[in-house]
UniProtKB/Swiss-Prot annotation:
PROSITE patterns registered for this protein in UniProt: G_TR_2 (PS51722), IF2 (PS01176)
Organism of origin: Lactococcus lactis subsp. lactis (strain IL1403)
Disordered: annotated span: 50-91, 114-349
Keyword terms of this UniProt record: Cytoplasm, GTP-binding, Initiation factor, Nucleotide-binding, Protein biosynthesis
Region: G1, residue numbers: 452-459
HAMAP family reported in the protein's UniProt record: IF_2_B (MF_00100_B)
GO molecular function terms attached to this record: GTP binding; GTPase activity; translation initiation factor activity
Annotated segments matching region G2: 477-481
GO cellular component annotations of the record: cytosol
Ranges of biased composition (kind: Basic and acidic residues): 75-86, 124-157, 164-185, 199-233, 286-307
Annotated spans, G4: 552-555
Compositionally biased region (Polar residues): 267-280, 317-331, 338-348
UniProt-recorded name of the protein: Translation initiation factor IF-2
A UniProt-annotated Pfam family: IF-2
Length: 944
């Protein structure tokens, strides 16, 4: 790093320790938390200088007092336990007569008191030197909290001359080699500010009284460390090595472990040294004081009930150690990580009382938990009430209507049964008054449906309106599914629906009339009124839609508009000139030569203006399916006409018995759009299945509701389909038996759009051939797939593809399964082919044809052969392959085949008129003279 350096990198370069550098940086006020913290180059220089200065001063000034650390003092005390009592209480150091005289002047009780005060009040003593010695400013505040007794007693003798700086010199002059070894061992340690001048007992007591307020904040950490050291005493060995090991593992353990070392030293077996300064009762007093302070600290730390459960119990050493350890780790000025977890001693608030509602709207199937939430009562209370009433339930068990009303009335609540709204009924939105808002109504484009007989020019007229070549895309020039388009005329939009004119598309014409506002009835001037023209008139009248008559092809030589007008009046369509109130507008046009087309559009706009067509674009969109198909790449595609509201991309939608989310929307020009307003035809993707043409659609609030409504509608449709199964009863028994003898042609229909498949199925079922009927096994949209081949093979069906092709795998499978696939693009050719196939399936019909008559003249009985009758042909002929009836006195006594036929002795195929011959009737020998033979054949006749 060029600009910044980490503390550990500086330590490697300078040879200093990480702790020294971190301490120096913190002293200088830099934001350094650990050895991995980064500082700038300028800050690094300051930290290095400060650390080196502190190290030098530590080696010169403070190392000697620090050498009197707990382990060394404990070791020296142990070595001189019996023969060198001067290793403790200053005797190992003090050899000056003046100092000895002053020590002798003090009584043993005063010395014990001094030691006790030094051990308990040391933080107060260390606080003063800390401010007076600039060398020790880098030491943590915690290090000054606990001080071992030995060091304090030793420093007491040395403090007679000077402060901390003078102390090392005096000690160096008077110390034994043991002290020198201690000094060498603690060179790397920081100076201990705890080695201070200890005054007389009277002075210390005065300072204690004056500094008692300052002392309180140090008591907590010191006592916690004392408790932790008490817990570790059993793990120490005789020479106190356990304390040393713990001290080495602490990164900043100078001050924290001093209190531990003091206690360890006191318990390591240095009895003589302790006795020389401490009376027998001093240990009890010290422990009693510590217990008192610990309880005070626990009370201070407790806020409305401590997590540890109040004051520490003196007799439970295990809990003391555990609680003291926890409190030691959380000493952060009341901001420990466990402070927020302290339980409150404030009593729990009582449950608020809720008033019972006057009435409750319920629905059948509610459980106890639902009722409890509604009336703000406990579920157990309701279960108890029901149990007392003799009903055993749990809180999740559904309740019937009587039980719900009973429990509500017991509480004094009036039960009101909820009226369930059938959200799957989207048809109600088209007739519901409250769905649309009058204030949001705006003018909408008119929806115009073009109707008329086949080849009367409907698509050509629309093609002129759109200025495109729509007609070229139609097979044979016949429109075979609805096209929805939108054009502009005089600044206003008009939506056109082009419907088929072929007789097979009756349902499509009815569907187009149901969603339209105006009907343009196209009639060819040379053909006049045709069957589909009459049908279109009836559809428009049934829907209550005004009719505009467009008399087309007036450019042809044989055009006769007057005759067309006369024929239309016979079917209830009158010109406005004849019936001003209910008359229809008549416009003579030529779509081929664009003659009078503007006049026709102006008439459409005029009629639309009179109708005052309006819609509410603010509501969720509703409308009708114009057409639907299945695309191999896009899936289900539906052509919709939005009638109310605005449809957006990603709207959850229910279309007929299917549902989905609007994935994409395209207009009649094939362009992607984001929204579609009223009277707009669009083509969308995203449905789960192909809907039926003519189904209604509605947008729901979310996809979950749309899914539920779609699945419910599909379930109901399936149920209705199952209910349509015919049941055999006495009324239809004869028809059922007759149908059992009737043959059927099984057909699978696959078409490009739903409307074409529907029309084709209806047309095929109308074919009437006696003895044969059409059975539509399956009808769907999309390409012919392998599953269709498998179904056809299983049901022995013929597959008819209308504007679709089979896939490669389907074609191979059809060849293997020997399934017949017929592909067509014009509907009437499909009808003719199916009708021919139906006639070919019929059993042949035969009629009896009499070819001759003969009279028996003689009979001959031949053994082992039978009776041979000699006959004379009186009319026609007798053939060998014909049948014969034996008639006696006008009664047929036998009908059978001719076994053999001979003319004289020769076998012949037939015997002509006025000739004699002999024959033998198969399985009949009772032939007599004068019997008559009636010879006939069964001849097949053609079925019509």
């Amino acid at each position: 790093m060029s600009d910044k350096k980490r503390i550990n990198q500086i330590a490697k370069e300078t040879g200093l320790t990480n702790a020294e550098l971190v301490s120096a940086a913190q002293t200088l006020g830099f934001e350094v938390k650990s050895h991995s913290s980064s500082v700038t180059a300028e800050q690094a220089e300051k930290i290095i200088q400060s650390a080196k200065t502190g190290t030098d001063q530590t080696a010169k000034v403070a190392e000697k007092p620090v050498k009197k650390s707990q382990p060394k003092a404990a070791e020296s005390a142990k070595k001189n336990k019996e023969d060198h009592p001067r290793t403790f209480a200053g005797k190992a150091v003090v050899e000056d007569p003046a100092i000895l005289a002053r020590i002798k002047a003090k009584e043993e009780a005063e010395k014990a008191a001094k030691v006790e005060v030094a051990s308990t009040e040391h933080p107060v003593v260390t606080e003063k030197p800390k401010a007076s010695e600039p060398v020790k400013k880098a030491e943590p505040k915690v290090e000054a909290k606990s001080e071992p007794k030995v060091e304090k007693v030793e420093t007491k003798d040395n403090t007679a001359t000077s402060k901390a700086e003078v102390k090392p010199e005096n000690v160096a002059d008077k110390k034994e080699p043991v002290v020198t070894e201690e000094k060498k061992k603690s060179l790397t340690q920081k100076p201990r500010i705890q080695i201070k001048v200890i005054k007389r007992a009277e002075d210390i007591k005065k300072e204690q009284a004056a500094a008692r307020p300052e002392k309180k904040k140090f008591d907590k950490n010191r006592n916690d460390r004392n408790n932790r050291s008490d817990n570790r005493r059993p793990n120490q060995n005789g020479n106190g090595q356990g304390g040393n090991h713990y001290d080495k593992n602490r990164s900043s353990g100078q001050g924290q472990n001093q209190g531990q070392k003091r206690d360890k030293f006191a318990s390591s077996g240095s009895a003589p040294a302790t006795d020389s300064f401490t009376p027998a009762t001093s240990g009890k007093t010290s422990r009693r004081d510590r217990d008192r302070k610990k309880s005070d600290n626990n009370r201070d730390n407790t806020k409305d009930g401590n997590r540890k459960g109040g004051p520490l119990r003196v007799n439970d050493n295990r809990n003391q150690v555990r609680n003291a350890r926890n409190s030691n780790w959380n000493q952060k000025g009341g901001r420990g990580r466990y402070q927020n977890n302290q339980s409150s001693s404030v009593p729990a608030t009582q449950r608020k009382f809720h008033e019972l509602p006057e009435s409750l709207e319920y629905e059948v199937g509610m459980n106890v938990q639902d009722i409890a939430k509604s009336i703000k009562r406990e579920p157990a209370e309701i279960i108890k009430k029901l149990f007392m009433m003799g009903t055993m339930v749990n809180q999740n068990q559904s309740l019937d209507e009587d039980t719900i009303e009973l429990i509500l009335m017991d509480y004094g609540v009036t039960p009101v049964k909820k009226v369930e709204e059938d959200k799957s009924d989207i048809e109600r939105l088209f007739v519901e008054d409250g769905y649309l808002k009058e204030e949001n109504m705006v003018e909408r484009p008119a929806v115009v449906t073009i109707m008329g007989h086949v080849d009367h020019g409907k698509t050509t007229l629309l093609d002129r309106f759109r200025e495109s070549r729509v007609t070229e895309g139609e097979a044979g020039g016949i429109t075979q599914h609805i096209g929805a388009y939108q054009i502009k005329a005089n600044g206003k939009k008009i939506t056109f629906l082009d419907t088929p004119g072929h007789e097979a598309f009756t349902s499509m014409r009815a569907r187009g009339a149901s969603v339209t506002d105006i009907t343009i009835l196209v009639v060819a001037a040379d053909d006049g009124v045709m069957p589909q023209t009459i049908e279109a008139i009836n559809h428009s009248k049934a829907a209550g839609v005004p009719i505009i008559v467009a008399i087309n092809k007036i450019d042809k030589p044989g055009a006769n508009p007057q005759r067309v007008t006369q024929e239309l009046t016979e079917h209830g369509v009158f010109p406005v000139a004849w019936d001003p109130e209910n008359g229809s507008e008549f416009v003579e046009i030529s779509a081929k030569f664009n003659q009078n087309l503007d006049e026709l559009l102006d008439t459409v706009l005029l009629v639309a203006e009179v109708q005052e067509l309006k819609a509410d674009p603010t509501v969720r969109a509703i409308g009708t399916v114009v057409e639907a198909r299945l695309d191999q790449g896009k899936g289900a595609i539906a052509t919709l006409l939005v009638q109310q509201g605005t449809l957006h991309v990603q709207d959850p939608i229910v279309v007929g018995n299917t549902y989905g989310r609007v994935r994409t929307m395209t207009n009649d020009l094939g362009r992607r759009i984001k929204e579609a307003g009223p009277s707009t035809p669009i083509e969308l993707t995203g449905l789960s299945d192909v809907p039926q043409a003519g189904d209604h659609f509605a947008v729901f609030e979310d996809e979950k509701a749309a899914r539920a409504a779609g699945e419910e509608r599909a379930k109901r449709a399936q149920l209705i389909k199952r209910q349509n199964t015919r049941r055999v009863n006495l009324d239809n028994l004869f028809d059922t038996l007759k149908e059992g003898q009737t043959k059927s042609v099984n057909i699978i229909i696959k078409a490009d759009v739903q409307g074409s498949a529907e029309a084709l199925a209806a047309s095929l079922q109308k074919i009437e051939v006696e003895g044969v009927k059409v059975d539509i096994v399956h009808s769907a949209v999309g390409a012919i797939s392998e599953s269709d081949i498998s179904l056809a093979a299983a049901s022995n069906a013929i597959i008819i593809g209308f504007n679709v092709r089979p896939t490669g795998l389907a074609r191979e499978q059809a060849a293997q399964e020997e399934v017949d696939i017929r592909l067509h693009s014009i509907i009437y050719k499909v009808i003719e082919e199916v009708e021919t196939a139906m006639r070919g399936m019929l059993d042949p019909e035969f009629k009896e044809e009499i070819i001759g008559e003969a009279i028996v003249r003689e009979t001959f009985n031949v053994s082992k052969v039978g009776t041979i009758a000699g006959f004379m042909v009186i009319r026609g002929k007798v053939a060998r392959d014909a049948s014969v009836r034996v008639i006696r006195e006008g009664v047929v006594i036998h009908d059978g085949a001719i076994a053999s036929l001979k003319h004289f002795k020769d076998d012949v195929k037939e015997v002509g008129n006025a000739q004699e011959g002999g024959l033998m009737v198969e399985d009949f020998n009772d032939v007599e003279i004068d019997d008559t033979f009636e010879v006939y054949k069964m001849v097949e006749i053609e079925r019509k």
